[in-house]
């Protein structure tokens, strides 16, 4: 009987892993389709937008149709928009994101160079958000009617309403120019204590992107709901640790859901923060590429951003399936 029970547990775990594996494969296939759709939409928008990437190469000259045609022919670029899209798609399928029209450098290399800076910024800001939101949410869930809980919640909402760019300029003026607490340099200047400079954009993005208030509100509501469930009341009556029973549904799942849902907004805020702080990340590179009509760079960054958002959604699905394997089949 003991061996039979152990075998049943092993079979159940294998079935759960199999369901999670099927879910991951399904999500990866969906990600490929979504990236294809994003690439098509972005390419069409760039094609319909005013300006011409070939005008960048003809800067200082009269960019007539003949000049554009000669440049297009020299670069081997198809004349139709769908021909250019299919050519780009074929190159991307082989891992080639093209070459920057402005610099002549491969787009993949530029993304690899600037990508870690944006990754540090986004992950660091999420850490700041959680360090602020989680304690306030836990305290507010436990002391819903307390004056301090209400004051903390109000303060979070007020801070989250501050525009990112405004807070960034205020922080630069106050902590760099007036108080001199942080160095006046950027990630492109690897001087002593330059790591201090990254703290300012991380804190600004983590505080003023609206995520703090959303995470606080969602965690407080979910914790309040879970704490009124019958199994929590039963655990409390038996003297069992309530937090251990409420952790998954009241904390882990809501927090994972909010992080995945707010990832696009964090990336959007990173574009503004990188511009304000002169931070050499993908957001600043995307703005420069938009000004230069550097379509290959814009397409490459759009693909990386879409893949990053989908990765956050995939991790959310894996965590959900790990907590409750039945969700992997839904």
Residue ranges of model-derived segments:
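Charged, compositionally biased N-terminal leader segments and the immediate start
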Residues: 7, 11-48
């Amino acid at each position: 009987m003991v061996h039979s029970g152990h075998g049943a547990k092993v079979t159940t775990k294998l079935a759960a892993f199999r369901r999670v594996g099927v879910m991951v494969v399904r999500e990866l296939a969906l990600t490929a389709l979504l990236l294809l759709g994003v690439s098509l939409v972005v390419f069409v928008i760039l094609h319909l937008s005013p300006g011409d990437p070939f005008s960048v190469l003809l800067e200082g000259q009269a960019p007539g149709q003949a000049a554009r045609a000669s440049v297009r022919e020299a670069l081997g670029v198809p004349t139709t928009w769908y021909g250019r899209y299919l050519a780009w798609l074929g190159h991307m399928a082989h891992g080639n994101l093209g070459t920057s029209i402005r610099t002549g450098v491969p787009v993949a290399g530029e993304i690899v160079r600037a990508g870690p800076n944006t990754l540090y910024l986004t992950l660091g800001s999420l850490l700041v958000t959680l360090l602020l939101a989680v304690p306030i949410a836990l305290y507010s869930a436990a002391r819903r009617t307390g004056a301090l809980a209400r004051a903390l919640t109000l303060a979070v909402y007020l801070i989250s309403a501050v525009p990112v760019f405004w807070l960034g300029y205020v922080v630069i003026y106050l902590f760099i120019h007036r108080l001199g607490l942080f160095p006046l340099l950027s990630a492109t200047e690897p001087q002593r204590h330059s790591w201090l400079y990254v703290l300012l954009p991380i804190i600004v993005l983590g505080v003023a992107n609206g995520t703090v208030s959303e995470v606080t509100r969602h965690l407080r509501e979910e914790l309040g709901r879970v704490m009124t469930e019958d199994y929590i009341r039963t655990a409390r009556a038996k003297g069992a640790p309530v937090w251990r029973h409420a952790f998954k549904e009241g904390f882990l799942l809501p927090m994972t859901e909010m992080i995945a849902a707010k990832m696009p907004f964090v990336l959007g805020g990173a574009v503004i923060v990188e511009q304000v702080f002169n931070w050499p990340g993908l957001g600043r590179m995307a703005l420069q590429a938009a000004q230069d009509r550097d379509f290959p760079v814009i397409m490459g960054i759009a693909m990386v951003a879409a893949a990053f958002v989908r990765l956050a959604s995939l991790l959310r699905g894996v965590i959900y399936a790990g907590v409750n394997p039945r969700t992997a089949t839904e």
